[in-house]
């Protein structure tokens, strides 16, 4: 009996051992004796950089970028240790701001901020959401070498010292999260974020180290400045396994090595049907669809991917309407409409082409709201019908291979004979 999450609910599936291609999740890794000491030691031994306390001067202002509710990074446990380092250099709390790098996600509510950052931090330093559409709080700094406009949060740019804190996970289309990603798309403007995502719209990039999006992020960071990063690798319970700090490129590459150790999971047989459970990252389809790209790497061409992701907030709170409209068009038409400036939400265009890539190569089935599923032109299956469907497919094909990926938004399947 295979147990798999659909949100917090556990579904039990009877998949014969001879038909099970794989049943995988992120690799188990020893948890440090002290999570806080792991973080503290990382700050004491940064990679490619001086210690943070040796970078800042007592009269300087500091902005800390932290991720939002769609990421599991324990900001409430990391930031206090970073503050210790800043305070030891003579920085006062009123010289520090935390900007939540929401990218184009919706702003976090006060309750969500308290849950992720803690009431103590909220009382200690100023914490605010980035707003990618508030042009009064953005600055245009020209273009990158690829021509992407450098539009960035004004308060971030005006700070003397800028620190990014985030997590390391496989990510499409960037390859891996972490590093300069906290800056772009984290605190960039709408056009900048959209153009970056369009760079990786049509090719599978999950788990790659050098990608067009990653290069653009790092060019962007080189232009506007990102003095220090703190990146963590976590287990499925949100415990910090490894912390890497320092230069936004050199430290990030070291962190990615650890990411491969934890999230790179070997399998030896491709599946005809892959069940991809995204729990706990299943807020909306623009987050849950990461489980499609993970499953792509483990599914036979022309096979089926079934995404188990409730997506309680629908397609995407800030991009859903445009994504729903664009679902009727192929990539050529979307590129044509972009060229003719017929699409205002360019990020939604990138997301739509990501999904077109999956639909072109696989039968893609969603276990979420049936209306949204239909609008997005995916196949639909309910949680109550999944077992019957698998039984039916097994009766038709006794050699059918079924694979299961748990917490699929953080798994990088790696084929190994």
Task: Locate predicted features.
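N-terminal amphipathic/basic leader segments beginning at the initiator methionine
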Residues: 1-42
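Glycine-rich phosphate/diphosphate-binding loops that line cofactor/substrate pockets in enzymes
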Residues: 47-63, 88-94, 265-272, 299-300, ...
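Short glycine-rich or small-residue beta-strand-to-loop segments that form or flank ligand, phosphate
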Residues: 61-72, 97-103, 274-277
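Histidine-anchored nucleotide/phosphate-binding helix
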Residues: 71-91, 288-299
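C-terminal non-catalytic interaction/assembly regions of soluble proteins
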Residues: 87, 289-417
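An acidic, phosphate/nucleotide-engaging active-site surface
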Residues: 108-176
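Divalent-metal (Mg2+/Mn2+/Ca2+)-assisted nucleotide/phosphate chemistry catalytic cores
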Residues: 145-208, 217
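Membrane-embedded hairpin module used as a gating/binding unit in multi-pass transport
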Residues: 207-281
